[in-house]
Amino acid sequence: MLKPSIDSLLKEVPSKYSLVILASKRAHELDEGVQPTVESFDSVKSVGRALEEIEAGTVISDPNPEEKRERLRIEREERKRQREQEQKELENRLRDEKN
């Protein structure tokens, strides 16, 4: 028997299609290093871990994916600006130390 079972997973999402999409997206997030929402996993693979998180109810489908995409885009841009600012500050400090 597969764990988590499809029956327990379908209690958390509205359809098999939604389950596949959610598990796939969450597995990609886990592969990218996003913090897990469950402390320990039975599975070593990211898809299995994503399914375990879904079963635990700690990962849900976003009701407004476009808004989430925009929010993530803004967050990425902000992180990029912060890295650039830190790089400029470091370059300025190094330049000042040389003078």
From Swiss-Prot:
GO terms for cellular component: DNA-directed RNA polymerase complex. It comes from the Bacteria. It catalyses: RNA(n) + a ribonucleoside 5'-triphosphate = RNA(n+1) + diphosphate. Residues 55-99 are annotated as: Disordered. PANTHER family: DNA-DIRECTED RNA POLYMERASE SUBUNIT OMEGA. Promotes RNA polymerase assembly. Latches the N- and C-terminal regions of the beta' subunit thereby facilitating its interaction with the beta and alpha subunits. Belongs to the RNA polymerase subunit omega family. This is DNA-directed RNA polymerase subunit omega. The gene is rpoZ.
